[in-house]
Amino acid sequence: MKILVINCGSSSLKYQFINMTNEDVLAKGLVERIGMEGSILTHKVNDEKYVIQEPMKDHKDAIKLVLDALTDKEHGVIEDMSEISSVGHRVVHGGEKYANSVLIDEDVMKSLEECIKLAPLHNPPNIIGINACKALMPNTPMVAVFDTAFHQTIPEYAYIYPLPYELYKKYGIRKYGFHGTSHRYVSKRVAELMGKDIKDLKIITCHLGNGASICAVNEGKSVETSMGFTPLEGIAMGTRSGSIDPAILPFLMKELNLNLDDLNNLLNKKSGVYGISGVSSDFRDIEEAAEEGNDRAKLALDVFHYKVRRFIGSYAAAMGGVDCVVFTAGLGENSAESREEICKNLEFLGIKINEKKNNEGRGFAKVISEDNSKVKVFVIPTDEELMIARDTNEIVSNLK
């Protein structure tokens, strides 16, 4: 079975085409600037890159171009579209209804529309991508894989906010959590690497990129996560503030004469390590500036490392212990310095980092803790696309 995995943004589209027989990525690519001038498709096969610049007025045009690239006589990997067994779609928000991935039908589409109010930036392009694929491949099964689904096992006492309860019942205001597909993948992978049943493990997974979240996984289930009703809650991120005193918001609105859109923009796009450092939202730039003596850049990193460290400690308390910690995503996988700083002062939990292991190599799964470290620490590259493909494969196989 060969599965196309689609991840639609507002003006972009990422894809992978995976042969599930051996889980090989046959092709992958990125479409940028959809609906704008200079729209471009970068298509990769066996590390060979092909760039196609062609006008794409919408996501349907973009997906048609992706299908053309996959079936191209020179650069393609299949002869025709009948070789695409099914399509797996990343969907950011499934609300409370979906705790698992699901075959897309009319009822599912209706539910996705209802979730737009919970994810106004993310769900609309996800829906547009699904509709475009359905128009181009009407007889191909489609599966929705939700970022929020993995966190539906979080207990009620952990997901309820201390607000009037009727706000939860009427508006669905509660913790949902995000990056669920990534947290699910690396928690399963670390259990495999440790040679243990995931049901016997207490795992803390740290998805650290421009967007970042921490997850507590107990017996294979998410029991707590740092992102909340939106991806704004939690640790300081690239441009997002993370959790702050809510009373700051009306104070800022009054003092700076901000409206709600201004405030939303400030919290989501001008805060985080970018807001503190004044340098960049890219951690590589901030690390470089800190090394050159920029005090605000160093402060931004100190704040970030402290926030992550604090969540690791609190999640160990939430689970009554921890067996392993996993670092993943851009920063988690590539910054040995950040991993080392985060793990400082966590010796009381039984975490001991091996400097040599932490600094050697990247791009593969590895243990970075000392052999006698009570809590094992891993770096594991995430693979959300493979997780989406696996879910899609399982659901579609059961249809037959």
Curated annotation (Swiss-Prot):
Q: In which pathway does it act?
A: Metabolic intermediate biosynthesis; acetyl-CoA biosynthesis; acetyl-CoA from acetate: step 1/2
Q: What does the note under cofactor report?
A: Mg(2+). Can also accept Mn(2+).
**Site annotated as Transition state stabilizer: where?**
H179, R240
InterPro entries from the UniProt entry: Ac/propionate_kinase, Aliphatic_acid_kin_short-chain, Aliphatic_acid_kinase_CS, ATPase_NBD
The UniProt record lists the keyword Isomerase:
no
Annotated Mg(2+) binding sites: N7, E384
Q: Which reaction does it catalyse?
A: acetate + ATP = acetyl phosphate + ADP
User: Where does it localize?
Assistant: Cytoplasm
Task: Tell me which Gene Ontology terms the entry assigns under biological process.
Answer: acetate metabolic process; acetyl-CoA biosynthetic process
Q: Which cofactor does it need?
A: Mg(2+); Mn(2+)
Q: What is its EC number?
A: 2.7.2.1
- What family does the entry list? Belongs to the acetokinase family.
Name of protein: Acetate kinase
Q: Give the source species.
A: Clostridium tetani (strain Massachusetts / E88)
* Taxon lineage: Bacteria, Bacillati, Bacillota, Clostridia, Eubacteriales
State the gene name recorded for this protein.
ackA
